[in-house]
Design a protein with these regions (language model features):
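Formylglycine-dependent sulfatase
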Residues: 1-334
Length: 334
């Protein structure tokens, strides 16, 4: 009997934030079930580690200079052969649910799938619009839960006489990190260990390391950390890029006049030193990131439980991966 294939992918999930890897940052018991029951990849690298090119490479099995999807802004030509097309031709039922990020419209929408329901672009964490078989519809709830609900709904309504191939793609934990309200406070009782290289001065490193605009200390946005962005211009923070309305949180030498406000609770945060501010940014970033991952682990557990209940676990290949990893404060980066 040919095996079913369940392919689950998240976005920007660092291996350090999976407890099966032993780093102690968080607990992911359901992801660990996959590792314990199969193979854990310890040396797996992305050749073009940004969302769109990585997804194109996974889908087509080709390098980006071959499939043409070389940047975040290039879209896939959906006439390309892909894994779903090959499997469907051999008798599999195929479905794609969640983050696509390879372009919208007829030339770029998913092909090779009997059913698809995808987020446009990055999509939203709460009440996301989804494009289902070419038609937009707004779904109520939290994206990680919704993507799992829709995946399970398709599985329950498929043809049970044929094997299935399901690509379940989560938006989480991509910036801006938005944990479900049930998870927002789960890491608040203790601090996350700061990496030894968090304050890297980049001496004796390549110039690109110092130039990279992804430092937790100076490049995090208000929205990254669940903070209110004040009204105003450059005095409340530099624009993230030309044309953006989002601003970076300031990192002044003397932060005693800086007040940051929690977007959810209204709590105010003040700082006496620059190092205290840097520590706050790291803790806030990490706790929101890890809390966002918690919902992924819970929902992976729902899918594994479904396989057990249906008696399909032994004949289903389950793969969990991310489109790329993430820096968790290592060398000061996110």
């Amino acid at each position: 009997m040919r095996p079913n294939i369940l392919f689950i992918m998240s976005d920007d999930h660092a291996s350090k934030a999976i407890s099966a890897y032993g780093h102690g940052l968080n607990q992911t018991p359901n992801l660990d079930r996959i590792a314990q029951g199969g193979m854990r990849m310890d040396h797996c690298y992305v050749t073009n580690s940004i969302c769109t090119p990585s997804r194109a490479a996974i889908l087509t099995g080709t390098y980006n200079h071959v499939n043409g999807v070389t940047t975040l802004d290039t879209h896939i030509d959906n006439r390309w052969p892909n894994v779903a097309k090959h499997l469907r031709q051999s008798g599999y039922q195929t479905a794609m649910v969640g983050k696509w990020h390879l372009g919208e419209g007829k030339p770029h929408e998913p092909t090779g799938f009997d059913y698809w329901s995808v987020l446009p672009g990055q999509g939203e964490y709460f009440d996301p619009v989804m494009i289902e078989m070419g038609k937009e519809r707004t779904e109520s709830g939290y994206a990680t839960d919704i993507i799992t609900d829709k995946s399970l709904d398709w599985l329950n309504n498929r043809d049970y006489d044929r094997p299935f191939f399901l690509m379940c793609h989560h938006k989480a934990p991509h910036r801006n990190f938005e944990p479900h309200p049930r998870d927002r406070d789960m890491f608040n009782k203790k601090d996350i260990k700061v990496p030894n290289t968090y304050n890297d001065d980049y001496k004796n490193r390549a110039r690109a390391a110092e130039a990279a605009r992804m430092r937790v200390r100076i490049d995090t946005k208000y929205s990254d950390l669940g903070l209110v962005q004040p009204e105003g211009g450059a005095e409340v923070g530099d624009l993230c890029f030309e044309g953006s309305t989002e601003r970076r949180i300031p990192h002044p030498e003397d932060p005693r006049g800086l007040v940051l406000i929690d977007r959810h609770t209204g709590e105010n945060f003040t700082f006496e030193t620059q190092e205290q501010l840097a520590h706050f940014k790291y803790q806030r970033y990490m706790k929101r990131y890890l809390a966002t991952i918690h919902a992924i682990d819970e929902n992976v557990g729902r899918m594994l439980d479904w396989l057990d209940e249906e008696g399909l676990a032994e004949n289903t290949i389950v793969i969990y991966t991310s489109d790329q990893g993430f820096f968790l404060g290592d060398h000061g980066w996110f």
